[in-house]
UniProtKB/Swiss-Prot annotation:
Name under which the protein is recorded: 2-C-methyl-D-erythritol 2,4-cyclodiphosphate synthase
Site positions per UniProt: Transition state stabilizer: N53, S151
Reaction catalysed by this enzyme: 4-CDP-2-C-methyl-D-erythritol 2-phosphate = 2-C-methyl-D-erythritol 2,4-cyclic diphosphate + CMP
Gene3D superfamilies given in the database record: 2-C-methyl-D-erythritol 2,4-cyclodiphosphate synthase
InterPro entries from the UniProt entry: MECDP_synthase, MECDP_synthase_CS, MECDP_synthase_sf
Cofactor(s) of this protein: a divalent metal cation
Pathway involvement of the protein, from the record: Isoprenoid biosynthesis; isopentenyl diphosphate biosynthesis via DXP pathway; isopentenyl diphosphate from 1-deoxy-D-xylulose 5-phosphate: step 4/6
Oligomeric form and interacting partners: Homotrimer.
GO biological process, one term: terpenoid biosynthetic process
Chain residues that bind a divalent metal cation: D24, H26, H61
Cofactor note: Binds 1 divalent metal cation per subunit.
Amino acid sequence: MTEIPSSFVLPDPEWIYRVGIGQDSHRFLPDEDPKPCILGGIIFENTPGFEANSDGDVVFHAICNAFSSVTHKGILGGLADELLKTKGITDSVVYLQEAIASLKPTQRVSHLAITIEGKRPKLLPQLPSMRKRIAEVLHIPLDSINITATSGEGLTAMGQGYGVQCFCVLTIMEYCRY
C-alpha cells in the first residue's frame, strides 16, 4: 500500500460551502391588468404582472427558495404567507430580506447564478439593473451575481409567452471549526 506524503494531508477546514437551488414561476395576468411586471426588483413597462398573492417577482422568489434549501426555513409558503396575511406585505424584497436573515451568523453569500426563461419581457437590456438591485438587497459584490436569460425556443409555456420561470443556484460559505 502506498503511503500518502504528509504534503498531501489537508488542514482542518475552516470554510465549508453549501449550495442551494431555487425555482419559481408565475403566469401572466391579462394584458389590460394594471399590476406591474417585476423581475429581480425591476419594473418592466408594457408587460402585465403575474398571477400571485405577492408582487410575483419570480427572480426574488427563486432566490428565497434557494436560501430555504440551505437554511431549512420556509420563506415562501410559510413566513411570506404570514406577512401577507397579518401585515398585507406583498413586496418580495421583504421576503428576500427575511431569507437573508435566516442565515447563521457564520454564513455568507458567496455567489448567485440565475437563469430566467420566458418569451417576454425582453430581459437583456435590464440584466445589468437586475444584477445591481439583487446585489444591493443581498449586500454582496456585483461580480458575485450572474443572470442568463432564454426564450427556451418556445418549447415550454414560458417560452410561448404564458409566464416566466426562474432557476437559481446559491453558494453559501460557512465558517466552522471541526
